């Protein structure tokens, strides 16, 4: 019998929309503050620090982190862990430019690891678009590990 | 500037990971998870005895290294894996090297290492060199 047969399957959440309705804009003040917090000066050409890819998509997606966890039938208080984050840019994030977020959950896969026991591996994809329409300027795939203590 | 496979990327160093920065990021991320803000919560959860840096801050350190190394380029793609926690007060060093050069694109691999503990993040990036 395989390990996977020892515990119930993960909730079927692939395809869940993470489209947001909120408009997200990086202000010059926020960008300067973020840059200082990570040890660099803000760019002089109007581009925001590229790590805003993560912040903007998380804040303006259609669910909170706790809400995404709830969709996966996971209590955020149980401690989701970041597994990986990938981003592909087709253009820079600009200070003062309004953006909106589209996206979806790609998969939720239940696994067993020696270190963490039973866990669900959540992968979701988010895109950052100009708020007035047009192609996404970036696409990001984030992977979270959701330890299933109750199944350990 | 010219780039070659095997070139080492100049490191980017944070001498002491800032707990105040974590407070800023709790606002940026609209996520007041107390493991980034309250050491007593970290202790209670058995996660250590210092507050834990938000993961994307570690990504920013590695981006800083890449942006400094390629002032004539932009990050086109980047993937990073989170291998361990970074704590307040840690000395963090992002470093890397060039693994491929193809026309106006440079491929890199990199890591973020903590003094005394080793690698906590690792990944790859593609830099597009501007004409």
Please name every model-derived segment.
Chain B
Residues 1-13, 85-131:
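HotDog/MaoC-like acyl-thioester-processing domains
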Residues 44-98:
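Hydrophobic beta-strand-centered segment that forms part of the acyl-chain substrate-binding groove
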Residues 35-40, 76-77, 105-106, 118-120:
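Glycine-rich loops and low-complexity Gly/Arg-rich segments
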Residues 16, 21-24, 42-44, 59, ...:
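A broad, structure-centric signal for solvent-exposed, well-ordered loop/edge residues
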């Amino acid at each position: 019998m395989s390990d996977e047969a020892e515990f119930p399957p993960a909730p079927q959440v692939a395809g869940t929309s993470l489209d947001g309705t909120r408009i997200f804009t990086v202000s010059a003040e926020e960008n300067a503050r973020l840059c200082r917090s990570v040890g660099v000066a803000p760019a002089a050409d109007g581009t925001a620090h590229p790590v805003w890819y993560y912040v903007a998509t998380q804040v303006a997606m259609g669910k909170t982190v706790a809400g995404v966890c709830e969709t996966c039938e996971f209590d955020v208080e149980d401690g989701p862990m970041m597994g990986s984050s990938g981003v592909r840019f087709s253009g820079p994030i600009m200070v003062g430019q309004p953006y909106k977020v589209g996206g979806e959950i790609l998969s939720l896969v239940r696994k067993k690891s020696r270190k963490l026991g039973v866990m669900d591996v959540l992968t979701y994809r988010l895109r950052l678009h100009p708020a007035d329409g047009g192609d996404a300027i970036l696409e990001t795939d984030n992977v979270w590990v959701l330890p299933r203590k109750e199944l350990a | 500037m010219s780039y070659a496979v095997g070139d080492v990327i100049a490191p980017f160093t944070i001498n002491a990971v800032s707990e105040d920065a974590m407070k800023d990021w709790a606002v940026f991320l609209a996520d007041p998870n107390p493991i980034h803000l309250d050491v007593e919560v970290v202790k209670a959860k058995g996660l250590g005895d210092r507050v834990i840096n938000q993961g994307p801050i570690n990504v920013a350190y590695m981006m800083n290294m890449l942006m400094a190394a390629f002032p004539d380029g932009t990050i086109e793609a980047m993937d990073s894996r989170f291998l361990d926690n970074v704590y307040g007060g840690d000395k963090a060093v992002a470093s890397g090297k060039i693994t491929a050069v193809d026309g106006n694109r440079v491929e890199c691999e990199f890591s973020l290492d903590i003094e005394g503990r080793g690698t906590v993040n690792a990944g790859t990036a593609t830099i597009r060199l501007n004409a």
